């Protein structure tokens, strides 16, 4: 009887020790937050950015949920924008920085961040911005480490 009780006690302790480890690995979810308005991006471009961010989170094997403990949010800034004249049509060029932050909601601590430069071209600034957002590759090695 004494052996059975100690055996059950050891099994119970092992279950308590193993379960939190597996639930932490499987239960991670990150919410994606994109501002409703931006100085640089219009509503359609913000939707495109949100889709890219959700793809980045999903590509990492983490679920993208709106009610998550962690949030991923972007800071998008245009560093340089120019219009190259010549030929039959002018070409707009945009060099921008996209910084992604993962923040813990309960204490606002930044857990991780990554910054990358994106470039785009088009017949106007709007098309160049869309091209810059399209150049973000969710499955790239930069995001695998992020």
Regions found by a protein language model. Name each.
Residues 1-6:
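Positively charged n-region of N-terminal signal peptides that target proteins for export
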Residues 8-17:
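Bacterial N-terminal signal peptides
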Residues 17-54, 145-146:
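A structural "domain/chain start" motif
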Residues 52-63, 135, 139-143:
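Structured segments of extracytoplasmic/periplasmic soluble domains
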């Amino acid at each position: 009887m004494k052996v059975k009780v100690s055996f059950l006690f050891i099994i119970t302790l092992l279950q308590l020790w193993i379960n939190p480890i597996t639930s932490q690995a499987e239960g991670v979810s990150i919410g994606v937050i994109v501002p409703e308005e931006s100085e640089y991006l219009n509503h359609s471009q913000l939707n495109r950015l949100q889709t890219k961010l959700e793809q980045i989170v999903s590509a990492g094997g983490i679920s993208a949920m709106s009610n998550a403990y962690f949030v991923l949010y972007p800071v998008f800034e245009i560093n340089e924008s120019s219009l190259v004249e010549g030929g039959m049509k002018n070409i707009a060029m945009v060099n921008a920085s996209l910084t992604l932050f993962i923040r813990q909601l309960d204490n606002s601590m930044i857990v991780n961040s990554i910054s990358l430069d994106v470039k785009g071209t088009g017949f106007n600034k709007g098309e160049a911005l869309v091209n810059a957002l399209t150049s973000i590759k969710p499955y790239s090695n930069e995001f695998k480490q992020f």
